[in-house]
């Protein structure tokens, strides 16, 4: 088993447990951060009992694989009855024997080695399963953050529409604008209210979806400032997750062990027998010793050996290609992070100030009669669209960051350790 599986077992358990114990005390004081969400989900993972049971099963299988073949005790009666001189029981012979088959070719060791690889695979596959869970939780956390930001954006849109509505109403009252301008402003406010209501419902759904990973009720706060942090784009992502590669390596080791087992099956097992024979006719005793061994004339297990060797070759290729493919995905996501971060920063630095300035100027000109209400609507739409585009860029950034975290195993330290089989 890879060293990191055992080396961090106690540490990872303590980290996850500490988060789980501390969370109820801090839930009302601090916003729910990603590490806390991951720790809650890990401690509430409903699949852990099944993993513990699989570990026990794999350990039992390894113990069973190491046992020797059972001996055989038998009794044979010969010449008990028949014809001629054998018609009487006086010439009967009784034999009591002890028989033992021997494993040759390292069969028992090969069986045990293959069974032990199953324990490693159960452990490692559980770690990969938890990393997949962490990815789902992180994506749900991002979705909840973005949904909260959408609520704030919808509220801003409503505020802008209501402010414009007040300005239009004043102009309509003094007959500087026609009545339909007021009706249009009312429509804009109504649409903004609907958008806010929809955003709030979407945010509630996103929070409940996130809380469902630990059977919570969504009663937590999220820090809105987290969404603006794009510093991860400047950090080196790291290599592919050790857990994913360890699974592929363990599968290769299992394939190698299977080759050894099939090769050992090609070696024929002898059977030895020793016993005592009682000759009723003369009341004499005799010792018998014998043995047998199958002739490898037809079944040499060649097909099974070739199949196991081909599977080992496939496992070797899977390990090499798996690492290469993961490194490519990591590089692509790293580049995507930089692009998304750059887009969000440039919108914030270049587009939003200009759009906000445009809204202020158009509004000022509208109050002086230099612009129509359509100009106000267009300027407001440009501002809202720019903020929405920035939010989309941040959502894509954090989505790619979650995918990158899964590929690199960034949250592996939070995986609860399984102590069923040591």
Predicted regions and their residues:
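Bacterial Sec-pathway N-terminal export signals of envelope proteins
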Residues: 27-77, 92, 101-102, 110, ...
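Bacterial N-terminal signal peptides
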Residues: 13-24
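Acidic, low-complexity, intrinsically disordered peripheral segments
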Residues: 3-6, 389-422
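Periplasmic alpha-helical coiled-coil/stalk elements that build and connect Gram-negative outer-membrane
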Residues: 2-5, 129-242, 333-340
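Amphipathic alpha-helical coiled-coil segments
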Residues: 50-65, 129, 133-158, 163-166, ...
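Membrane-embedded beta-strand positions in outer-membrane beta-barrel channels/transporters
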Residues: 95-97, 141, 271, 288-290, ...
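Transmembrane beta-barrel strands of outer-membrane/channel proteins
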Residues: 73-79, 272-278
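A glycine-/polar-enriched beta->alpha junction
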Residues: 39-49, 56-71, 85-88, 96-113, ...
């Amino acid at each position: 088993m890879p060293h990191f599986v055992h080396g961090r077992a106690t540490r990872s358990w303590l980290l996850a447990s500490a988060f789980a114990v501390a969370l109820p005390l801090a839930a009302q004081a601090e916003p729910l951060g990603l590490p806390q969400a991951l720790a809650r989900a890990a401690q509430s993972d409903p699949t852990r009992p099944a993993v513990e049971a699989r570990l026990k099963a794999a350990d039992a299988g390894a113990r069973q694989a190491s046992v020797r073949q059972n001996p055989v005790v038998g009794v044979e009666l010969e010449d008990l009855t028949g014809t001629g001189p054998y018609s009487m029981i006086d010439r009967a012979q009784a034999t009591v024997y002890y028989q033992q088959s021997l494993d040759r070719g390292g069969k028992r060791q090969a069986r045990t080695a293959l069974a032990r690889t199953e324990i490693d695979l159960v452990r490692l596959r559980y770690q990969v399963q938890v990393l997949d869970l962490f990815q789902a939780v992180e994506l749900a956390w991002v979705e909840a953050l973005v949904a909260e930001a959408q609520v704030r954006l919808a509220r801003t849109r409503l505020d802008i529409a209501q402010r414009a509505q007040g300005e239009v109403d004043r102009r309509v009252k003094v007959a500087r604008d026609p009545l339909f301008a007021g009706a249009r402003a009312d429509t804009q406010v109504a649409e903004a209210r609907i958008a806010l209501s929809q955003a709030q419902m979407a945010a509630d759904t996103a929070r409940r979806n996130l809380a469902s990973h630990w059977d919570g009720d969504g009663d937590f706060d999220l820090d809105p400032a987290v969404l603006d942090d794009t510093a991860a784009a400047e950090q080196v992502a790291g290599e592919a997750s050790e857990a994913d590669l360890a699974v592929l390596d363990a599968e290769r080791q299992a394939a190698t062990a299977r080759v050894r087992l099939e090769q050992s099956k090609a070696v024929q097992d002898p059977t030895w027998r020793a016993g005592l024979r009682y000759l009723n006719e003369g009341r004499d005793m005799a010792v018998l010793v014998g043995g047998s061994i199958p002739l490898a004339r037809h079944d040499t297990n060649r097909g099974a050996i070739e199949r196991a060797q081909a599977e080992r070759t496939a496992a070797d290729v899977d390990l090499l290609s798996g690492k290469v493919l993961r490194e490519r995905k990591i590089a692509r996501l790293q580049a995507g992070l930089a692009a998304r971060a750059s887009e969000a920063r440039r919108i914030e630095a270049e587009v939003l100030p200009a759009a906000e300035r445009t809204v202020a100027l158009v509004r000022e000109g509208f109050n002086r009669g230099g612009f129509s209400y359509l100009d106000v609507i267009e300027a407001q739409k440009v501002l809202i669209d720019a903020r929405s585009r920035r939010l989309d860029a941040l959502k894509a950034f954090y989505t790619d960051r979650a995918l990158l975290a899964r590929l690199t195993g960034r949250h592996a330290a939070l995986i609860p350790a399984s102590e069923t089989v040591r």
